[in-house]
């Protein structure tokens, strides 16, 4: 996998590329002779550093989606809020959606900045037991576009995993970009040695979303990433007055439930549409504290409990 040193030029091909040290973009780079010699194409020393840095993190969960716009980052934010409601748990949320970092907005942290200490980057805290890190904190404006090639994104992800000082953490939730790209390969490669519990895959009921989720599931199998389960988001609308459910996005091919049965993957639950979810993301507040008794909140709580049960069961299996 190609990677980019921090002091590399903008169009660096990456240390693992066959063009490393030879490309026109390499002219004048302080690393040119080292890259050209091939000494940087060996095992990445950062892998052991990441393993050591994350040794204090008990559970690591990736949140994936095959398609954008299905509520992946929304789920990541609410998963973090839900887990952090237990004050005895330390929770961390890492946003590696490099080109579309929405977590700062959803967590009410826009305008916050990252500070460096002797032990690494200090995350930004929402609550005493909920820490957040995102590339959005490194931008001068939330409207700035991140126009990076894959190798530079990989370098940023490596730096997040290696340099952020999370401390003792029970759950690290990693919000990824949609699809299967360089970022996903980087995260899986770096976390494979640190121990990753698995992935939660977010979808909506429509076939156009499910077909991309099937690709995501195949990706997980190929890279040996365990699948915790699938969450069907925007699954119907429950009227707050009459309590009847309407299918806004009808599951024309059986929805996530049939897909999970066909592919032998766990369905963690279905989250109904609720306009208050979008409102809470826009205002950066926890949906659980704002609307504690809504059907969506109850669904989230069930899903979060199933994720916790999976992680605890896996921990027992690993040590037995």
Swiss-Prot record:
Subcellular location: Cytoplasm
Pfam families in alphabetical order: ParA
Annotated SUPFAM superfamilies: P-loop containing nucleoside triphosphate hydrolases
Main location: cytoplasm
UniProt keyword terms in alphabetical order: 4Fe-4S, ATP-binding, Cytoplasm, Iron, Iron-sulfur, Metal-binding, Nucleotide-binding
GO cellular component: cytosol
InterPro entries, alphabetized: Mrp-like_CS (IPR000808), Mrp/NBP35_ATP-bd (IPR019591), NUBP1/Nbp35 (IPR028601), P-loop_NTPase (IPR027417), YlxH/NBP35 (IPR033756)
Keyword hit for Lyase: no
Any one of the GO BP annotations: iron-sulfur cluster assembly
Source taxon at top rank: Eukaryota
Family in the record: Belongs to the Mrp/NBP35 ATP-binding proteins family. NUBP1/NBP35 subfamily.
Subunit record text: Heterotetramer of 2 nubp1 and 2 nubp2 chains.
Stored PANTHER family: CYTOSOLIC FE-S CLUSTER ASSEMBLY FACTOR NUBP1 (PTHR23264:SF35), NUCLEOTIDE-BINDING PROTEIN NBP35 YEAST -RELATED (PTHR23264)
Biological role stated in the UniProt entry: Component of the cytosolic iron-sulfur (Fe/S) protein assembly (CIA) machinery. Required for maturation of extramitochondrial Fe-S proteins. The nubp1-nubp2 heterotetramer forms a Fe-S scaffold complex, mediating the de novo assembly of an Fe-S cluster and its transfer to target apoproteins.
Protein name: Cytosolic Fe-S cluster assembly factor nubp1
Organism, scientific name: Xenopus tropicalis
UniProt gene name: nubp1
């Amino acid at each position: 996998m190609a990677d980019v040193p921090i002091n590399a030029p903008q169009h660096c091909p990456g240390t693992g590329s066959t063009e490393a040290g030879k490309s026109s973009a390499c002219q004048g780079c302080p690393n040119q002779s080292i890259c050209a010699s091939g000494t940087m194409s060996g095992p990445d020393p950062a892998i052991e550093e990441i393993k050591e840095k994350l040794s204090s993190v008990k559970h690591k969960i990736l949140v994936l989606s095959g398609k954008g716009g299905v509520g992946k980052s929304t789920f990541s934010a609410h998963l973090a809020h839900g887990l952090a409601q237990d004050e005895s748990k330390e929770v961390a949320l890492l946003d590696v959606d490099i080109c579309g970092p929405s977590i700062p907005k959803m967590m009410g942290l826009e305008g916050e900045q990252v500070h460096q200490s002797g032990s690494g980057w200090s995350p930004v805290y929402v609550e005493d037991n909920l820490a957040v890190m995102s590339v959005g904190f490194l931008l001068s404006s939330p409207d700035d576009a991140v126009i990076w090639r894959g190798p530079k994104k990989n370098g940023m992800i490596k730096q997040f995993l290696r340099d952020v000082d999370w401390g003792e953490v029970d759950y690290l939730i990693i919000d990824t970009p949609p699809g299967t790209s360089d970022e996903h390969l980087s995260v899986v490669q770096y976390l494979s040695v640190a121990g990753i519990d698995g992935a939660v895959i977010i979808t909506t009921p429509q076939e156009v979303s499910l077909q991309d989720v099937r690709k995501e599931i195949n990706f997980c199998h190929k890279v040996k990433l365990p699948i915790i389960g699938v969450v069907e988001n925007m699954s119907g609308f429950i009227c707050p007055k009459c309590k009847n459910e309407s299918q806004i996005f009808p599951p024309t091919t059986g929805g996530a439930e049939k897909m999970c049965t066909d592919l032998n993957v766990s369905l963690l639950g279905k989250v109904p549409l609720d306009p208050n979810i979008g409102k809470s993301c826009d205002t950066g507040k926890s949906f659980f504290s704002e609307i504690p008794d809504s059907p969506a909140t109850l669904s989230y709580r069930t899903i979060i409990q199933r994720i916790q049960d999976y992680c605890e069961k896996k921990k027992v299996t690993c040590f037995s």
